[in-house]
Amino acid sequence: IAERGQSLSRAGYNQYGFGQHTRTLGDVQALYVQLGKTVRRLRLKLGWTQDVMADRSGLHRAHIGEIERGQTNVTLQTLKTLADALNVRITDLLKGL
């Protein structure tokens, strides 16, 4: 992980070998916005309105709108629900994040 003679922390890793990344609130918000754009793009590719997406996913239409605008935290369960409704993998929703 670290180059010879370089400490783990200087190489950007903690004691367990995991990267030490500090994200700001703005960084996290940008991830949710990008996720929302991906969900919207995939929904529109299927020709679905938010109402149809709500019916297919079991999520409330207003919640789908919040997700697409990046205005809400998205749980792993919600990611799975969205992926299943859109017939994609969770990783497809997370590409580019």
Q: Over which residues does each language-model region extend?
A:
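Recognition helix of helix-turn-helix/homeodomain-like DNA-binding domains
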Residues: 58-72
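A short, Lys/Arg-rich alpha-helix, primarily the initiator
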Residues: 21-45
